């Protein structure tokens, strides 16, 4: 089994050096740990490194059908990969596609209606959910400032505060890099 087999790119493209390195790390984890049965059928589509505030984070893209399987082992996988890549934060995001908005006046009878899961809003919301996993988004407030800019306040599950609080800056930076939207994360008290 070659290292690249853990990285299967769309259009049969060749993985770059960084993606091969990530694929090799996942393959080593599969060979050495008790995660072998869960990791056997899993692969990634691409990986990239983003820099923010003199820190680095690794974004690993996984195919949407394999996302549930990845999430079952994600906490252990993230812990092991962060050890391997000297403390860089690792996030898993499903590889989703945004279809363009249908234009008025242009008639294309063969074209299918655009599914909700391919809209910009749905994809951006799903990216947010993927980023903060295993925590859950329990609420969201969008504050529109007078100059028209938006600030999204995301309320996360208070029970997960201890596990992900140290990564909140990473989540905000990665989300800004991927979507261009400012976001802040909060852990509000549970109101009954």
UniProtKB/Swiss-Prot annotation:
Gene Ontology molecular function: any one: structural constituent of ribosome
UniProt xrefs under Pfam families? Ribosomal_S7e (PF01251)
Task: Please name the InterPro entries in this protein's record.
Answer: Ribosomal_eS7 (IPR000554), Ribosomal_eS7_CS (IPR047861)
A Gene Ontology biological process in which this protein takes part is: ribosomal small subunit biogenesis
Q: What does UniProt give as GO cellular component?
A: cytosolic small ribosomal subunit; small-subunit processome
Q: Does the keyword Iron-sulfur apply?
A: no
The record's keywords, sorted A to Z, are: Ribonucleoprotein, Ribosomal protein
Does the keyword field hold Ribonucleoprotein?
Answer: yes
Q: Which residues form a coiled coil?
A: none
Family assignment from sequence similarity: Belongs to the eukaryotic ribosomal protein eS7 family.
Protein name as catalogued? Small ribosomal subunit protein eS7
């Amino acid at each position: 089994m070659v290292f690249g087999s853990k990285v299967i790119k769309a259009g049969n493209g060749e993985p770059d050096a960084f993606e091969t390195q990530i694929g090799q790390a996942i393959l080593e984890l599969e060979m050495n740990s008790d995660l072998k049965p869960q990791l056997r059928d899993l692969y990634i589509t691409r990986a990239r490194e983003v820099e923010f505030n003199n820190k680095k984070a690794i974004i690993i893209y996984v195919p949407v059908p394999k996302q549930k399987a990845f999430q079952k082992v994600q906490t252990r996988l993230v812990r092991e990969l962060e050890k391997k890549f000297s403390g860089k934060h690792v996030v898993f995001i499903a590889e989703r596609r945004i279809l363009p908005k249908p234009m008025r006046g242009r008639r294309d009878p063969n074209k299918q209606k655009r599914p909700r899961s391919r809209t910009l809003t749905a994809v951006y919301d799903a990216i947010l959910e993927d980023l903060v996993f295993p925590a859950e988004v329990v609420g969201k407030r969008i504050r529109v400032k007078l100059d028209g800019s938006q600030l999204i306040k995301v309320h996360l599950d208070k029970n997960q505060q201890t596990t992900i609080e140290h990564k909140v800056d990473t989540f905000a930076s990665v989300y800004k890099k991927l979507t261009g939207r400012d976001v802040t994360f909060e852990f509000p008290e549970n109101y009954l």
